[in-house]
């Protein structure tokens, strides 16, 4: 869905919600949760702030939460505290009787938006002309339903940061090359870890409609869409050097959405779940610098007072679009459902959903 069409269907939060006290909003949210009971399910992504996550019935990554939503057959109303592409995935995986809502329709994802379906459809025939029928597309689940549908239509699969290696390996058994979108860093880091040389990777620039490479075309194994996560691209090698200087014994762990240079400079890299599990299992007194979203890092710090934990970039701000989900929007969304006039329902059309689900199903078949 384009930004323009998204804004056209957005109903703005009534101003009186912003005037409410935190105590009153929390009380009214709890009241509706109690009233609706099992008919309501609130999944909350790891990157949500604490004021929202306290009301989540489950926390996790985007795919995990979408699957939990689908498995919760009693829930008629799923209020997804995350961003737009996550709610889309939940809508596609849930049944027709289950309705998915996003408290603030402006909660998008800059990385997902970097892979526009129109640009992707323009790129594909050019890549086919360059490489022939030798490419399997892979899309990160952090992508729009339209991009997932494109991937499914062309025989590809979705990936998560946890299973990207397995899916890249699978894709190479299908065809000679992969087309990875929208996050170039996850694609590059994953392929490199599997032994693909950096010089055998090229970047597709959707703004210029060109393949950026200095290598002969026949050497290219991985085509990376020129997209990135604005949060994780904010971590730099300089940040790792500062930590090494100020905290020599501190281990650095980062998300693979960070650049190759940062991953190389870190001690470890892995998915959100991997980071959480690693810190959970670390001995008391251990020291960590974490390169991922600030709300999650702050939550990990609170959960582990026995460990020294900092953000790799302590001056960094949380994900701005995730932070659009707040108490006023959550309360407004819940009360609109309770009053029988729900706002901000997420609906993916049947044709897009069918093709997108094929890419998700290929991924799930590999797990």
From Swiss-Prot:
Tell me its EC number(s), please: 2.5.1.72
The record's keywords, sorted A to Z, are: 4Fe-4S, Cytoplasm, Iron, Iron-sulfur, Metal-binding, Pyridine nucleotide biosynthesis, Transferase
The residues that hold iminosuccinate are 45, 62, 140-142, 161, 255-257, 272
Q: Where in the cell is it found?
A: Cytoplasm
Please classify the protein's predominant subcellular localization into one broad category.
cytoplasm
- What one GO molecular function would you report for this record? 4 iron, 4 sulfur cluster binding
Gene Ontology cellular component annotations, sorted alphabetically: cytosol
**Reaction catalysis annotation:** iminosuccinate + dihydroxyacetone phosphate = quinolinate + phosphate + 2 H2O + H(+)
Its pathway, per UniProt, is: Cofactor biosynthesis; NAD(+) biosynthesis; quinolinate from iminoaspartate: step 1/1
Please, which domain of life does this record's source organism belong to? Bacteria
Cofactor(s) for this UniProt protein: [4Fe-4S] cluster
Function (record text): Catalyzes the condensation of iminoaspartate with dihydroxyacetone phosphate to form quinolinate.
What family does this chain come from, according to its entry? Belongs to the quinolinate synthase family. Type 3 subfamily.
The record's annotation in PANTHER family points to: QUINOLINATE SYNTHASE, CHLOROPLASTIC, QUINOLINATE SYNTHETASE A
Name of the protein described by the UniProt record: Quinolinate synthase
From which organism does this entry originate? Lysinibacillus sphaericus (strain C3-41)
